[in-house]
Amino acid sequence: MHKRRVVVTGIGVISPNGIGKDNVYNAMISGKSAVRLVDGFDVSTFNTRIAAEVRDFDPFVFGLSHDEAVRMDRYVQFAVVAADMAIKDSNL
């Protein structure tokens, strides 16, 4: 079996603790928790009212067009935007 090398050249992050590598890093080193009361949808039928939600994500701010955004699930939007961030971060 051939061992293949992988080189990480760029990072893109969409997470409950922030959007972008610098925001996430700063939240992590400051010990900031992303767990809060859920406000993204009705949780009255669930046993818990807290979660770590991705907040303040606007796909249009990060370059997706309206046509692209409406064709993508929210999580696909996260992946596409994070991949774009990683490509830009790589300076390739």
Residue ranges with predicted function:
Residues M1-L92:
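Conserved "HGTGT" condensation-loop signature of ketosynthase/thiolase-family condensing enzymes
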